[in-house]
């Protein structure tokens, strides 16, 4: 005879994995066309100049350049300043 009652199994102990959302390229960072700048759910950040938006609201660079974040009328925008317009930081270093 068993001297202890069999323990029940827990039905907890699992969680979904994180979705790896957020800003991937920050302000003044260099990007090339096609680079993902922001992965998001919904439009927390809106696409500005030279930035495209994917079906899942991912923002990506349409041209080579540098990332800029700006707020206009309560909306956050992400733009890419083309490489020839941006100050050449690499040349100075």
UniProtKB/Swiss-Prot annotation:
- Example of a GO MF term: structural constituent of ribosome
Query: What processes does the entry annotate via GO biological process terms?
Result: translation
GO annotations of cellular component type: cytosolic large ribosomal subunit
The record's section on Gene3D superfamilies has: 2.40.50.100
What keywords are assigned to this protein?
Ribonucleoprotein, Ribosomal protein
Q: Which PROSITE patterns match?
A: RIBOSOMAL_L27
Residues annotated as region Disordered? 1-22
Q: Pfam families, per this entry?
A: Ribosomal_L27
| Family, as annotated | Belongs to the bacterial ribosomal protein bL27 family.
List the NCBIfam families.
L27
Family annotation (HAMAP family) = Ribosomal_bL27 (MF_00539)
Protein's name in the database: Large ribosomal subunit protein bL27
Give the source species. Answer: Methylobacterium sp. (strain 4-46)
């Amino acid at each position: 005879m068993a001297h202890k009652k069999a323990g029940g199994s827990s039905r907890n102990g699992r969680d979904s994995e994180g979705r790896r959302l957020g800003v991937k390229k920050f302000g003044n960072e260099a990007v090339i066309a096609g680079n993902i700048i922001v992965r998001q759910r919904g439009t927390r950040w809106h696409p500005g100049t030279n930035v495209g938006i994917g079906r899942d609201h991912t923002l990506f660079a349409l041209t080579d350049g540098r990332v800029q974040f700006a707020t206009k009328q309560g909306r956050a925008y992400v733009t890419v300043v083309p490489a020839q317009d941006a100050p050449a930081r690499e040349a100075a270093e």
